[in-house]
Amino acid sequence: MTDTTKIGLKETGCITGYHAHVYFDADTVEQALVLCQRAAEIFGVKMGRVHDKLVGPHPMWSCQLAADPEQFAQLLPWLALNRDGLIVFAHPETGDELADHRDHGIWLGTGLELDLSLFA
């Protein structure tokens, strides 16, 4: 069997959790709120504040869902099926915020440009 670290592959044991950021605007805030509340109810994930302003590296208003790896395995497909046009950006938490946002992110819908300058 090949040692994956010798060919640059990373082990997933460094992932302590995931964040899924649901993006919205003034017209879709209610839709995003319902989606995030249902996700929290169904999967037991932690729902963060609903930000009706830009926060962190995010280019749109957003609400964060925080999940452990087991929850995320169920949450991501559910978000894919139920986002109804909302954009979702998800990333692992490995302790390297820049790489997690820049290199390890998953987009549901149109990928947007993040402001990564705060991780420099």
List each language-model region with its residue ranges:
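Long, contiguous binding/interaction regions
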Residues: 1-120
